[in-house]
Regions:
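… and, occasionally, acidic/histidine-rich disordered N-termini of signaling adaptors
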Residues: 1-171, 220-241
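C-terminal catalytic subdomain
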Residues: 160-172, 177-241
């Protein structure tokens, strides 16, 4: 188990991207020694950055090994295919060919800091929450979500592209957040997270930390049943010198 834990930890990022004009926040906490959640920041050859949040079905050694394969294969496909949707389509084909009896939900945002465009590709995951600087909230790419990865080998994934204006935020998360249970066996729910993100915070870090604190307060003295992962990306508000 320690080996699987070490393998998994090796595939999680040790630092956040240093992209001028952007802030990042991430939180990862497995429910047990080895979790099935995965997130990553992948610098692409053309200056863009891919942000991935995924949830491998299951826990334990097999899930950790599958996550290792997912991580390596995602990096390979993104390095060799510039189109995010095509890269995920190829990633799915490769994972489906493994014929392992598990699948993975994944959402990816490819951020271009030159154009401030964010291209979202969704494979059966919760859509990111997008909060505009004005406080409006939506879930881009929800209607374009495809099947989870590794179920069928001939799925074509569709991209959704939005422009991040100054002050805009994207929040990506796994179902350990919205399905967190309180003592009455009630789920935290996406609506609570939406409301919290919509209210905003002084900084991206504060938003991330207050979101996790709210989920933890909901769980109370109960048990965290599932891995929890939250990743936030924010375009800074431009200040005039």
């Amino acid at each position: 188990l320690q080996l699987a834990h070490d393998v998994q930890k090796a595939f999680l990022p040790t630092q956040r991207p240093g992209i001028p004009g952007y802030d990042f926040y991430d939180y990862y906490n497995p429910a047990n020694h080895i979790g099935g959640d995965y997130f990553d920041y992948i610098a692409l050859p053309d200056g863009r950055t891919a942000i991935i949040v995924a949830d491998v079905v299951g826990h334990g050694v097999a899930a950790a090994m599958f996550m290792a394969k997912l991580s390596a294969e995602a990096r390979f496909q993104l390095a060799s295919e510039a189109d995010p949707a095509k890269a995920i389509t190829q990633l799915n084909t490769r994972l489906a060919e493994l014929n392992v009896e598990r699948f993975v939900t994944m959402v990816m945002v490819v951020l271009d800091p030159k154009t401030h465009q964010a291209t979202i590709v969704n494979a059966g995951h919760m859509a990111p929450l997008h909060r505009s600087a004005k406080g409006e909230i939506d879930e881009p790419g929800a209607d374009q979500s495809g099947l989870p990865l590794a179920i069928l080998d001939d799925v074509e994934y569709e991209p959704t592209t939005i422009t991040l204006e100054a002050g805009d935020i994207l929040v990506m998360y796994t179902d350990g957040v919205n399905e967190a249970m309180n003592n009455a066996s009630e789920c935290y729910g996406i609506e609570r997270l939406r409301d919290l993100v919509q209210r905003g915070a002084e900084s991206l870090t504060e938003l991330g930390e207050s979101s996790i604190a709210d989920v933890r307060a909901w769980i109370g003295n109960g048990v965290q049943e599932d891995d929890m992962c939250l990743v936030c990306v924010g375009r800074q508000i431009e200040t005039v010198a």
